[in-house]
Amino acid sequence: MKAFYRLFYYISILLSCILAGVTIAGAFSGTASPDSFKFMPFIGLGLPILLLVNLASAVYWTIRWRCWVFIPLIAIFSNWGYINCVLQFPLLDPASKPTVKVNAYTPGVLTVATYNVDGFNREHTGYSCKEIAAQMRNLKADILCFQEFGIDDEFGVDSLCTALSDWPYHYIPSSPEGQHLLQLAVFSRYSIKKEHLIIYPNSGNCSLWCDIEVNGRMIRLFNNHLQTTEVSRNKRKLEKELRQDNSQRAKRAALTLADGLHENFRKRAVQANLINQLVSASPYPTLVCGDFNSLPSSYVYHTVKGDKLLDGFQTGGHGYMYTFKYFKHLLRIDYILHSPELKGLDYFSPDWEYSCLLYTSPSPRDKDVSRMPSSA
C-alpha cells in the first residue's frame, strides 16, 4: 500500500508539471498566429478550464502541505494578463449590474451598447425588438451596435426603425449581390456622418465603421461580428456519432470539429489583422465593439486591441466578466474597446438571453475627449 501511495504521489507531481506547462504556454497564445502555431489557439480556448484545474491543483498541494503548490501557482500567475481581462475589483460586484446610475440622457455622458440579437428570435410580431428597445431606453443607451440584426419579411426595416425610433440615425448595410452576410446595424441618437461596410473573404461575417458626431466632435465606431465558431453545429454532429457508438465515425467527427475550429481561428486572425490596420488609420478617437467569437487569451483579441486601444472592462468594469451564456458562464467573447482619449466610467453585461454589453463614459466635447462610458 505504501508503494501505491508513493506512486500516486509521483504521478500527481508529474501531472501538475504537465498541466502547468500547458497552462503557461496558454499565456503566449495571444501572440501566436494560428497560421504559424496550429495548437496554440486550442490551448488559449481551453485556458479558463486550465486555470480552474490549476487552482484545484494548488488547493490539493496546499492541503497536503507540499512545496509543489508553487507549480500551479506559477502557471496561474503567468496568465495574469488573461485574468485581468475577466476579473476587476471590486470582485464581488456582479458584472451584470451597472455601478453608475444614468437616470436620464445626459449631454456629458455617452453610453454605447453592443448586442448580438440573433435575428430578434425571427419573430413576425417584432416583440423581441420592441423589448430590446425598451431595455436600451431604460439604460439610456446613446448608440446601439447590433450583430445578427436579421430582417423579417413581416417585420421589415420600416417596422424595426419605428421600434427603435429613439435612435433616429442608423446604418443598416445590405449584403452585396450574390452574398448572404450576417447582418449588422448601428442606431444612434447622434448624427452618423459617414459609414463603410467591411466584407471578409470566404466568410458570411462582416464588420462596419461609421463616423458619429458627438457634441461637436467626431468618433469612429467599429461594429464587428468576426468569424463564427460553428461549435454548436459541429458539436451536435459529434454527439450524434457518439450516440451511434461508432468509434471510427466519432473519431472522424472529432477531427472535423478540430479542423473546423482551426479554419475559423485562421479566418478570424485575418479579420483581426484588417481591423487593426483600420483602427490604426482612424483619424478620430475610436470605439471598437462587437462579437469577436474569441477569448481575451486569443490572437484575435490581442491583435484588434493592439497598442492603440484599451479594454473598456479594464478601465470601467467590475466583478467577473462573461458574455457567453453557455459553458457555465465562463467565456467572454464580446467586447467594447476604446482609444486612450476616452475613459470608461462603467462597463457591464446585463444577464439577458443574448450577449449584450454596455459601456458608459464622458462624451467627447468640443475640446475635451478625455473620457467615455461603456455598458456591457
Residue ranges and their predicted role:
Residues V53-L55, Y60-D93:
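Transmembrane alpha-helices and immediately adjacent membrane-cytoplasm interface residues
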Residues S36-L45, Y169-V186, A258-L287, F292-Y354:
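Active site of divalent-metal-dependent phosphoester/diester hydrolases
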Residues I76-P107, E123-T125, A133-R137, I143-E239, ...:
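Structured beta-strand-rich core segments of catalytic domains in phosphoester-bond hydrolases
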Residues S370-A376:
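Hydrophobic alpha-helical segments, chiefly the membrane-spanning helices
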Residues Y359-D368:
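Conserved small/polar residues in nucleotide/adenosyl-binding loops
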Residues T114-C129, I151, E230-N264:
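Acidic/histidine-rich helix-loop elements
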Residues S12-R64:
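Membrane-embedded alpha-helical segments of integral membrane proteins
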Residues V117, F149, L226, D291-F292:
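Active-site metal-binding loops of divalent metal-dependent hydrolases
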